[in-house]
Amino acid sequence: MADAETFAFQAEINQLLSLIINTFYSNKEIFLRELISNSSDALDKIRFESLTDKSKLDGQPELFIHIIPDKTNNTLTIIDSGIGMTKADLVNNLGTIARSGTKEFMEALAAGADVSMIGQFGVGFYSAYLVADKVVVTTKHNDDEQYVWESQAGGSFTVTRDTSGEALGRGTKMILYLKEDQMEYIEERRLKDLVKKHSEFISYPISLWIEKTIEKEISDDEEEEEKKDEEGKVEEIDEEKEKEEKKKKKIKEVTHEWDLVNKQKPIWMRKPEEINKEEYAAFYKSLSNDWEEHLAVKHFSVEGQLEFKAILFVPKRAPFDLFDTKKKPNNIKLYVRRVFIMDNCEDIIPDYLGFVKGIVDSEDLPLNISRETLQQNKILKVIRKNLVKKCLELFFEIAENKEDYNKFYEAFSKNLKLGIHEDSQNRTKIAELLRYHSTKSGDELTSLKDYVTRMKEGQNEIFYITGESKKAVENSPFLEKLKKKGYEVLYMVDAIDEYAIGQLKEFEGKKLVSATKEGLKLEETDDEKKKKEELKEKFEGLCKVIKDVLGDKVEKVIVSDRVVDSPCCLVTGEYGWTANMERIMKAQALKDSNTGGYMSSKKTMEINPENSIMDELRKRAEADKNDKSVKDLVLLLFETALLTSGFSLDEPNTFGSRIHRMLKLGLSIEEDDAVEADAEMPPLEDDADAEGSKMEEVD
């Protein structure tokens, strides 16, 4: 062998190795799954390359994974005839360059995640150190010579050109020198069970080098001769009886042979009725690196002008990086006639279904298809359309079981709402899957379909309110009249609801109407209409006074027919942002500051003519239009309405000061008795004309 070069592990990898070696994990068995998975990936790569250049397979025409337990040396060897690694690959991939998932995996472990998640973070190779204290990797790539990588995980590793070892032709051989307490992993039975449990559905043959003891039977001729010579015992017997009574001598002989462990053909090629739940679960785990079983599965084939088979899985929970836009999707593996092509095809499924895992095997796509030509491929567009249709079918199947659907909705409701926003073609279908709390649903969630069945006679609109939380909206002044008249209102309290509802204008012909925007019209009797007109006339003067005081803060002031108990509320324009949307947009770190100006609707102040505060204010305004207490109370009511209507205050301190002044008035504390710190506080307008000019208006 040539001289060895020594390299130091990159700091994060060193930390990871230290964590793996020094922490006790009960499920160390996952190392085999990870190493077989890596071998499978290497085989995928060489098979893909060979589609356009058959000579790539010359070094080793067969594609396989071999597992060799060695009880004499206490080693476990895994060999694959995959693409192999160059010297640069060895140095970079196995030690000096940390993958992006290294740090995230350590953070996940620290947060109590299971070590079996290691494959999801792209650092599965290092799981070998769960069971081995030394690992030797021999590898041969078509573009380089054969090299040996070796490390006991003590902070460094060596790489040597292999001049004397057995030639691999092409591929990788990994020898694990097992720790003393991990000898179970050289037991045939244990290894077979592990392959069947975790790697049954790998697309390449996985063979185990097994020891067989066979017994050879040799007839004992000498004993037979003695029998024949015995005196007085010569009898006539038939030939069959003679054969049965022949004595045999057994000799034990030990042999070795390859035993194929994963005998199943690809699961998607079998009929769904032939596959049990456990097989689907095992396939899902090997496909997704998840340690939990799936929530639901859809196995189907499409035939006709276009042929493909697919299996789609819905996980039980959302992955940690579900909405990570920088991460390439790898949820659907694309095969062409059983040959793996790629697992990061962005065009095969829309973003909002990025949580669905699965495999698609097409009979029609060309084997040598590239990512560039995929984008233009009409067949792929048809496959995508079918996958979306089948995903939605699967979600409706999950919805038949309330408990399962609650789990699904908790994990993936944001994806469905994103679908409403993005997928105009299936918007109506996705809308049927949405669930909300409402004024009549209690702790249960209700669907739009169920809402429609409960609608009052003559009701033609679906009412909803958006806000920060259920608690924040359930006692909103906007709901007072609706509740009083017996209308059900949906609570849309997820930030993404604002975006989704902007696209979902109606459901089953019923318009969706916001309780917080202009344009809310409720059915009225003739008496109610007459009374409303009278009150409108009676409070016209006060509306004008309030508008004069507030100026540009509001677009108009009108008599409300939506508030029953509260003195007033602030509604937004039908096509502008709601208070909740304004709050969401203000929280956007990279927002366009110019957008806020024209999208933040002008507010309309609606006053409640039957509220005692408003009635008293009307009397004061009629008695003296210039009464300064009217101005102060109007400002206070406006700021309070901002809060109860879901807006934020631009100057909360000034609002606080007004409240404190009110408290002093209520407690009959004279201004002279106030502490000096209150000197800057805006006084109430009725205290003194001179001080009135100090009053600050607040937006």
Curated annotation (Swiss-Prot):
Region annotation (Disordered) ranges: 219-248, 673-699
GO MF terms held by the record: ATP binding; ATP hydrolysis activity; ATP-dependent protein folding chaperone; mRNA binding; unfolded protein binding
Main location class: cytoplasm
Motif (TPR repeat-binding): 695-699
Name this polypeptide is given: Heat shock protein 90-4
Record gene name: HSP90-4
Cross-referenced InterPro entries: HATPase_C_sf, Heat_shock_protein_90_CS, HSP90_C, Hsp90_fam, Hsp90_N, Ribosomal_Su5_D2-typ_SF
Domain comment in the entry: The TPR repeat-binding motif mediates interaction with TPR repeat-containing proteins.
Annotated Acidic residues bias: 219-228, 673-690
